[in-house]
Amino acid sequence: MGAGGPRRGAGPPDGGWGWVVLGACFVITGFAYGFPKAVSVFFRELKRDFGAGYSDTAWVSSIMLAMLYGTGPLSSILVTRFGCRPVMLAGGLLASAGMILASFASRLLELYLTAGVLTGLGLALNFQPSLIMLGLYFERRRPLANGLAAAGSPVFLSTLSPLGQLLGERFGWRGGFLLFGGLLLHCCACGAVMRPPPGPQPRPDPAPPGGRARHRQLLDLAVCTDRTFMVYMVTKFLMALGLFVPAILLVNYAKDAGVPDAEAAFLLSIVGFVDIVARPACGALAGLGRLRPHVPYLFSLALLANGLTDLISARARSYGTLVAFCIAFGLSYGMVGALQFEVLMATVGAPRFPSALGLVLLVEAVAVLIGPPSAGRLVDALKNYEIIFYLAGSEVVLAGVFMAVTTYCCQRCSKDIPPGPSAEGGTSDTEDVEAERDSEPMPASTEEPGSLEALEVLSPRAGSPEPEEEAVPDLSHESVGGHEAHGQNA
């Protein structure tokens, strides 16, 4: 659908400008997940110039990842307050400025603050809003859209690392950081295309009779009262403890098994190539009519497959067995990447997705800071990769079993409650109150159109031929909250 005038009651376009938004989301996802790993190609030069150890230089990527995950609630607040496009533009500038300033660093601390904190924060302010906009533009094709967007991670990871190696050899790490900073300005271009979907102008929440209009929280913690959301949170925590460990240790594990360096490094390329194919394919599969209502179980199946792959391959020693492990791991890893945010969108709905995503990323940040570092310490202490693979696989299997069993129990418990109309086949626990409130008539609002009460908006009543007399500022129209009426269909 084109960007025509507002249409009353229109849902997500599922196409049109949404494909441009999907392309931008593909780029942002690639930068967010690929950039912290791509920076690691400069670590050898950083160690030489600063006289530091590997663990000291590795903190640059660690801080960047911690900012990407840990600032989720901050991103949610900013998106709810200002909208997706302004936050993404600011994030692109921050990410670029961080790398440019890092190219002039004379101490490791300066690298931590610039490339780590500033660039990590900038990537976080791009990643979360891009996923939110994707949910606003796609409903029927949303699983496919999520799979295609998630494919940006392996594509950029396999591209940025060789590019960084080339830039480092030709211009040094300072020149490489400077050019990477210019490359990150593409995040601003991606943010610029994030225009709101066509639809009615936003209207603020009404004031209760005889009182002031209700102030809605910028970070909606009420989503934590939803049982299915809490199940998802626990699943993501358990998953993040072990999901990334095999990929991190794979090359060293292969070398320990006697595989030559070049062939060991190629194993990661195999994982990346399979991952690129698996993500969009899994997204298309999850979008099929008969499978889409069961996406949480597909996610559980992907986790089980990934964990069992780790357990079965823990004793792999030959190169052929390791190649088979990489193919199976890349396939299951791609399935997890394609389904993780689709499950969250289906669980909480578009109106609560910004707050829910911020909380999930914060929980995942804690797990990421526990799992891989602990695995590294165990390897140093035990000199045994087999135990680490068993431990990581067990954690991921536990996450898959927990997701499947608790989802089934939640569905059984809610069978006696008649589901409300929803694109996903029902409403979550916390959406019923909102649906009941939204069905009431809209009285005149006493608040300014740009206030926080405009975060969740309603479509104009069918019997109202003319729009409100007050002009609504563009800032509110940009806000994700300004599209709740459309996002609820997601």
Swiss-Prot record:
InterPro entries: MCT, MFS, MFS_dom, MFS_trans_sf, Proton-linked_MCT
Extracellular topological domain: 36-58, 107-115, 169-172, 252-257, 315-318, 374-386
Membrane topology classification: Multi-pass membrane protein
One cellular-component annotation, GO: apical plasma membrane
Catalytic activity annotation: (S)-lactate(in) + H(+)(in) = (S)-lactate(out) + H(+)(out)
PANTHER family the record matches: MONOCARBOXYLATE TRANSPORTER, MONOCARBOXYLATE TRANSPORTER 3
Family: Belongs to the major facilitator superfamily. Monocarboxylate porter (TC 2.A.1.13) family.
Protein name from the UniProt record: Monocarboxylate transporter 3
Organism: Rattus norvegicus (Rat)
Gene name of the record: Slc16a8
